[in-house]
């Protein structure tokens, strides 16, 4: 049974429609990535944020362990948080579809840390050093931004598997403050932040899992790469059909100091400041 919790959509503004169309184009491009670039993760190739799988995980005797490395300086990320009310049923669906085929050669995102990356005050490509006083000032500025944001009503548009093995949920906005607007407000609030950010201004996506190796040989008729790509497409399609149309409400903006590289993705060491969105649409 598909995970549906749909309600009739609210009207959206012209700017939101424009951003929704921009997201559709982005998601179409992401969907083509696996076919255009192949399954790079099967060759232990580059994964997210210019890192390789061996930078992120060790796979020994069928057991996956994240490689936690201290981030110098800590990354300072602003993310929207997806409550476990929504993430847990999605996580369960992901595991039902993918676990039988990958056993432990897969890393499932912690369902208590599902998030949407918005804006970095400092990231691994362009580190921006900050004192404790400056960090507290950044956090206060982010809190002020959150107080002016309206909670987002969002709907899962599609599931995508990238060539780097990241299984993503790609979302659209039904109502509330658009991600592009949130990022623009954070840019203004954090003037020292890197000019080049990691993601498109309109995108709204969250990681569900990372595939780390080949599917179980016992479930494959042959080790042929094209057959594996076909299997990946089939699994993505199964999950897509289960959870497409799933709706959620996002009402928290987090300011996160990631003391370990990709701490949010790998259950690493971090400090989280949680801010409720304060806008009332009444």
Language-model-detected regions and their locations in the chain:
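Histidine-dependent nucleotide/RNA phosphoesterase domain, centered on the 2H-phosphoesterase fold
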Residues: 2-282
